[in-house]
Amino acid sequence: MRFFIALEIPSENLPQFQSIQTSLHTLIPQSKITNLDKIHLTLAFIGEQPDQLKDQLIQIIQTAVSGISSFEVTPAYIDGFPNLHHPQVLWIGVKGDIDKLLLIREGIKDGLESLALPVDERRFVPHITIAKFNNHFAINRGLEVDLEKLMVISFDPIKISSIKLFESVPEEGFHKHNSLAEISLKS
């Protein structure tokens, strides 16, 4: 299975992402918009691993969230990887209870390392991918200003009450995300 651990964005928050994506696609028609049913905030991409690892991954998540109560993050700014001027990915960064998010991420990272699984060592930037580009795309200063204007809407906070283990399944040139387990945070 191809595993990843993420925060699923609640359905009540999705219309605001859809609004941003619609405006984004108008500004940059060649952008490949992320399907709303795939909108999430990844905490760890684990990749292809044996199916029997599932129970150990669930245990890692349970340990990482132990004692952590529900919290909120709010979409706040737009950026890109590797950078906003030549993005392969456009994403929305979040603000709010980032300390809790980072604490969970570190717990997951420690658990993955204890199983000798590869862990992304780059600085963790909590983000929600909204679009991708197939080719090298350049964003000039004018377009950058237009993208920043997309974020002037007042986003509703996203209530984080659980962490999910997903599998990513190739399907007709895309990947379908199936939820394998949901681990609730403390109420």
Regions found by a protein language model. Name each.
Residues 1-187:
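Histidine-dependent nucleotide/RNA phosphoesterase domain, centered on the 2H-phosphoesterase fold
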